[in-house]
Amino acid sequence: MGKQQDWSVTACIFLSLSLASQIHCSSQTHFPSHKGGAGLSGDTSHFNSVSRENVLSLKEKDLIEKLPGQPSGISFRQYGGYVAVNEPATRFLYYYFVEAIKPSKSTPLVLWFNGGPGCSSVGFGAFEELGPFRVHSDGKTLYRNPYSWNNEANMLFFEGPISVGFSYSSTPFDWEIFGEQADKLTAEDNYMFLVNWLERFPEYKGRDVYISGQSYAGHYIPQLAQIILHRNNQTFINLRGISIGNPGLDLLIEADNENKFILSHGLVSQKDFEEYSKVCDFANYDMDECPKIMPKFSIEHNKHLDVYNIYAPVCLNSTLSSEPKKCTTIMEVDPCRSNYVKAYLNSENVQEAMHANTTKLPYEWKACNHYLNSVWIDADKDASMVPILHDLMGEGVRVLVYSGDVDAAIPFTATMAVLKTMNLTVVNEWRPWFTGGQLGGFTEDYERNLTYATVKGSGHSVPLDQPVHALNLFTSFIRNTPLPQTP
């Protein structure tokens, strides 16, 4: 599926991009939770349009003239606004859309999801990872990301479920049903968002569509893709492929294989690993001894270690700078970058420019709603996505799974264990892949159009930690070309 194109075009892109020098910010910062939805009034104009004129007016209304602090020389268009996902309209998801730098009628549409569940794709995906801008240390100004994925595609980021980021419900405590219905209702709302967004942007109907993301998007993406295929006889969406980085696909299998990564990177001793394997084994669980050894393996609680990239520094000072830091290189890590994004998106002039927070929500924008995560039912978190992946591949949907090789949250050892359970035949053996002469990682192809790749030196957020390799990986996938096998 997808058209073959000459890799030399991509090689030229990466050669020119490699000359760019920008600041690179990296880490995973947690924010307190909030409860969303109480006492809000919804604007029902965001829901179904009744005429082409209304569709056009809604689209024009969403056009972002210019983001505050945006650098000069930006030619691509940006949009932001709300799309209702139920009828009567009470649940509204916020989106941020950036057109491709060099758009054409064949340029694909790509949806991006972050995980959580309960984390913002606008905050993380658009402004920290693969969007066209990143936020300076002053929390007010932006700088270009030369490796933005809108070099190759039209990029659509939206925040869901309701109560995440700027998304909300006008029905009090509506968010509570997401704790009960969780994955199912989220998938339904995500589907209705896409259908209604395409009504507002009808020029993208019939385009090749790809769905990408990371982490708990390992649930969001397969479930949305499944609904799209099941309902394509009603509303056709030209889904060509899905790609998921460091994905949560089968929590139980992943949990059994995380400690191999922890041991191999020197985070625990061989003695402790052997003791853990002995007393915490599911079949021979020791109720007295396992709780004693368990804390040594709960590295996510170590405030001195970034579990999302074990080699990245942690943020020690959350204070914004009065002036932007001087430019360094895009590969340099700023562990406090999430604080800059939070300050930027909570600015009133930014919200006004992005057509966000139009109802004046009674809480500030946060990167993650941890309360929503806490009430998400365990049965959904534990559910395996492997059967859905098999169904999607059976319908001809191409699948790319990739892992940053220094992520301890969902390490490559866990993902490879899940892929092993799929019992797929390897068609192209394990081999290195390259970007601009540098080793990008390793890859393997399976039957039925599934590719797995590791990304050297990256943590949980591959487009953040290794933006050049990430763009190479993404471009190869949507062009349906092999990853370069030679330097």
Curated annotation (Swiss-Prot):
UniProt record, GO biological process: proteolysis
Cited Pfam families: Peptidase_S10
Primary site of residence: secreted
GO cellular component, one term: extracellular region
Residues annotated as catalytic: S215, D407, H460
One Gene Ontology MF term: serine-type carboxypeptidase activity
Coiled-coil zones: none
Catalytic class of the enzyme: hydrolase
Glycan-bearing residues: N233, N317, N357, N423, N449
Family (UniProt): Belongs to the peptidase S10 family.
Protein name per the record: Serine carboxypeptidase-like 38
Upper lineage: Eukaryota, Viridiplantae, Streptophyta, Embryophyta, Tracheophyta
